[in-house]
Amino acid sequence: WRQYVPSACTYENAVPHALLWGEKALLARLRGMEQADWVQAAHGSEGLWSKVWKAVQAQPDYERVLEASKSKRYPRTRLQRLLLCAYLGIDTQTLLREAPYVRVLAFDEMGRTVLRQAKKDARLTLINAGQTPPDEVYYALERRCAALYGLFAMQPELFSEQVARIYQKPLGPA
């Protein structure tokens, strides 16, 4: 994959993120959810929603929520997926939905060649920075998730600049 991704766009060069930096935002959102909201979250089930909801209300941090909810039946990874989907407002139907477009974030000369071919052969629409995709519902979800993910950035202002480059239309000639 490295041959298709410019080095400036690799994970190593991304704005640093960590759970710790956004933990309060995560817990605030999860604590504000009603039990009925948990039923909508992907990766849950009848007993799990109730168990996690109680842990979120009682535990002081994310790690303790996981510890209080974890069991043989509900492993840590499933709990993490449930909490992330609940935080982002993603239900099972949305999770199973096929992506309606591909957002191109960056490319070099080799990528330009690949994109030219992809435009001819692709089943999905290719969207560049500043373009609004045809599916408004999915686009709104994408923007909401990006905004919430930004709360986990060590330097939120740098992440905000990256998001602005992706979603804002470039200024044309005056």
Indicate residue ranges for each PLM-predicted region.
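Active-site cores that bind ATP or allylic diphosphates and position pyrophosphate for catalysis
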Residues: 1-174
